[in-house]
Amino acid sequence: MIQTPRELLNPRYTYHTIFSDVCKTRFNHLVTRLFFICSIIQTVVISLLALPHSPLWELALAFIPNILALNLVSLLIIVTRKNYMHVKNFGFANSLTFILGQLLSVKFLVYQGVYSMGSILLSFVLGVVFGRGGSGWKPYYKLFIWLVVPTIYNLQHHVTDADKLSFNCENFFQAPQDYVLERVKRIMEKSVILSVISMFVLPIFTTVFFSRQKSGLFDSFTNGVLAVTNLLIISCIIFITFEFINIAFDAHMSIGCLHKGKLISNLSSTPMETLLSGLSADKPFTRLTAYQELAYRATSLDPSLRAPIYHSKFRSSSGNTWSLILNECLKTIQINNEKVVQYLRSVQDLGGSATARHKKKVENLDYMYENGKLTSANERLFGNRPSMMAPLRDNGLLDESPNRLRVRTDDSVLLNRGNKKRHRSSYYDNDLDETTQTFNGSIFTHETTFMTAMRLMLKKLKNSIMSFIFPSYAERQSSDESDNYRLLPNGSNKAQISIIDIWSISKKRQAEKLVPLPICHANSVVALTGLLIRSKTEDPKGGIIASVGDILKTLERSICALGEFADWDPESMAYTAFQTQRTAQDRVQQDSEDEDSMKDTTDMISVLYQLSTSAFMEIVLEYNVALNDVYLDADVAKLANWFLEVYASGNPNAT
């Protein structure tokens, strides 16, 4: 396990502690400043609108209670948001399970109560202007305010996963006022749409709750245009208030890595050690912000922000500042690559003949992984060593020429360096004897989790009956069950696909499940690329330049792994073998020829694939001449040469 200086720091200087204090400050500013001022403004406007209908002394007496009621609404919502706020994706494989998981939860009930209370309080404050329902339609007014409006907003809140804070790798800081102003138009449009939907939903609720009432009650209500208009306006104001509170909360919680113009790690007396503790933090929000700061330092126009990385005097048993930063970034990238590859292996076609298994060329994934895990080797910290033996990929035959020097491509960069040595024979067995599989094989060839569970349940029922009738049968039951339950997904070599996945496979949701925190991956790529390019002129003799080979190697493997997922089409699960077994160069070249495939990047893994490709190209173009003196992996050199040829030919569409 890669060690970080987190344990060497005073607990109050860790990134998580400092960032927690910053979040508390932002939350307090949100409550005591923004929402308090907005409550006063809302109360003043409502009092002015109600002045023709109510006496001045009555409005004066209601002024303070109205402010407290409006403040209570905002406080209820943001406290609930704080408790359920998250930055990682939940990991649902498709939209159906996502919606069911969101709606069938305690969180949905909590929000239902919060929004119902908020709707009642807002209607009480607005009642001085729009009234609180006449004698003829008061039951419908209560139903609309207490149930319809909060339910509609709660449904859209959970379906859109409004509790998740969204970030991008382009903006590392955004002022809250700018965040809110950019979304004012969307707030208004969304509120109007939800208000109209609520009016159409109201008859359904009235049919359910007032089915035994006389029809004349509903007729007298619907025939009053003023009553319907009042409900429409009240619901719109309530939706605007709810949406503004949620947007303001998002704006203050997603400000970024700056606090009062300073980087969060600079609030500590040991900035680099604090930053490193954030990169390896357990809390996702802390890690995300730390990677934001690292990318901000790497791309900033101010070289003083990168000077501590170049010249930090901090050293530990695991290395200096840069080596620890490099370890964390490559670790983040490679873990995501491994998850993607393991998933693609899990949906492989289980078929394949013994003859075909010797004829396919495995150019990418198998040299990185063995049995779904990153391979390891006793390699140096930076760079790779050539090996006299390497897995052969041509016609399944080993090249026994002792004078042929081949490049080893099965070692992982800076990961699993302390693992035990593997058996070499198992690697060759994978290439020669493993059943050839395709990533887009029909999922109906798999035994689903549902069918496996049903089979085991029936067998357990049979064992129970047999044990009751024949007591001696019980002696074998426990051993049989332990053997049978190995067939479940967690202990199986056979890929298990849930029955819901058969009905509805969402590539976007699957990408969110595989890479739940893509912004950390993206900021890792941005940070490594920025530091490599900036250090060429700012620190030409430093250690960052020496790691260009390892970074290019990791990016090339990302292009292979993430590119496989970008090419994967769950709607047509029938790719040919040559479409799935391609090198990174083949993958990038076809994507450059097919503009549509580059534009259709709705899932985050495809976006990360394009980002990795762009970063690889930018580094290669920047280090063009210097790469001649750097040892490069064979696949890295091949892809780099192809990029340079394309760039020299002046074909912009190819890149």
Swiss-Prot record:
GO terms (BP aspect): mRNA transport; nuclear pore organization; nucleocytoplasmic transport; protein transport; spindle pole body duplication; spindle pole body localization
Perinuclear space topological intervals: 55-58, 109, 212-224
InterPro entries: Nucleoporin_prot_Ndc1/Nup (IPR019049)
Pfam name, any one: Ndc1_Nup
Locations listed in the record: Nucleus, Nuclear pore complex; Nucleus membrane; Cytoplasm, Cytoskeleton, Microtubule organizing center, Spindle pole body
Residue intervals on the Cytoplasmic side: 1-33, 80-88, 131-190, 246-655
Molecular function terms, GO-annotated: spindle pole body-nuclear membrane anchor activity; structural constituent of nuclear pore
Miscellaneous comment in the UniProt entry for this protein: Present with 3030 molecules/cell in log phase SD medium.
Subunit field text: Component of the nuclear pore complex (NPC). NPC constitutes the exclusive means of nucleocytoplasmic transport. NPCs allow the passive diffusion of ions and small molecules and the active, nuclear transport receptor-mediated bidirectional transport of macromolecules such as proteins, RNAs, ribonucleoparticles (RNPs), and ribosomal subunits across the nuclear envelope. Due to its 8-fold rotational symmetry, all subunits are present with 8 copies or multiples thereof. NDC1 may form a subcomplex with ASM4 and NUP53 at the NPC. Interactions at the SPB have not been determined.
The name this protein goes by in its record: Nucleoporin NDC1
Taxonomic lineage from the root: Eukaryota, Fungi, Dikarya, Ascomycota, Saccharomycotina
